[in-house]
């Protein structure tokens, strides 16, 4: 069982567990209110840098991740998305357990010519380690750049204030606590 690191994670865990009990479609985008997603905080082997992608939709440097789309193995989703969005070949979990939890608000937007209403992402984050020597490439339909940042620079690079303060800083604190 996941042990929350703070009040935010404890509340979000309770929301997620309640949502799972009440919704059979929690892992699909067919649930327009909320659905599960998986993200990765990708670090190099010395854990001094994090890999970020310039997200086209949010117009911000961001972690990697995506929708579960029916898959309940969220670690597999996080790994798949990390590889797809960055071109990484050598990437693996630091450990298989959940690293962080977040309930994230997504504004209404257009995707592939279709309106997507405001909804929540019930997000599970995994800590991944990658070979900083791997060639990186963007995934043009989702991002337009991928690069390594020093941990604190990764936070500063994001223009999403809420993500900086509530997610990326928390992830860096947790990485540093690992030693």
Predicted feature residues:
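Phosphate-binding glycine-rich loops and adjacent basic patches that engage nucleotide phosphates
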Residues: 2-3, 37-48, 117, 128-136
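Acidic, metal-coordinating catalytic segment for phosphate/diphosphate chemistry
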Residues: 3-39
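Short low-complexity stretches enriched in small and charged residues
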Residues: 7, 40, 79-83, 169-170
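Glycine-rich, flexible loop/turn motifs
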Residues: 23, 32, 57-59, 64, ...
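N-terminal strand-loop-strand
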Residues: 28-63
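Aromatic- and glycine-enriched beta-alpha-beta binding-site module
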Residues: 49-83
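Unchanged
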Residues: 69-162
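Charged phosphate-binding loop/patch that engages nucleotide di/tri-phosphates or the phosphate backbone
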Residues: 159-179
């Amino acid at each position: 069982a996941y042990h929350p690191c703070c009040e935010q994670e404890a509340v979000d865990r309770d929301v997620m567990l309640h949502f799972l009990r009440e919704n059979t479609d929690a892992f699909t985008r067919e649930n327009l209110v909320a659905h599960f997603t998986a993200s990765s905080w990708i670090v190099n082997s010395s854990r001094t840098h994090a890999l970020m992608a310039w997200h086209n939709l949010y117009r911000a440097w961001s972690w990697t991740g995506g929708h579960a789309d029916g898959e309940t193995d969220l670690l597999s989703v996080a790994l798949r998305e990390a590889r797809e969005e960055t071109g990484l070949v050598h990437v693996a979990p630091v450990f298989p357990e959940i690293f962080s939890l977040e309930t994230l608000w997504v504004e209404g937007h257009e995707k592939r010519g279709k309106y997507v209403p405001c909804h929540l992402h019930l997000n599970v984050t995994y800590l991944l380690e990658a070979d900083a020597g791997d060639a990186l490439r963007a995934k043009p339909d989702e991002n337009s750049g991928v690069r390594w940042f020093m941990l604190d620079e990764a936070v500063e690079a994001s223009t999403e204030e809420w993500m900086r303060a509530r997610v990326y800083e928390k992830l860096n604190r947790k990485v540093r606590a690992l030693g």
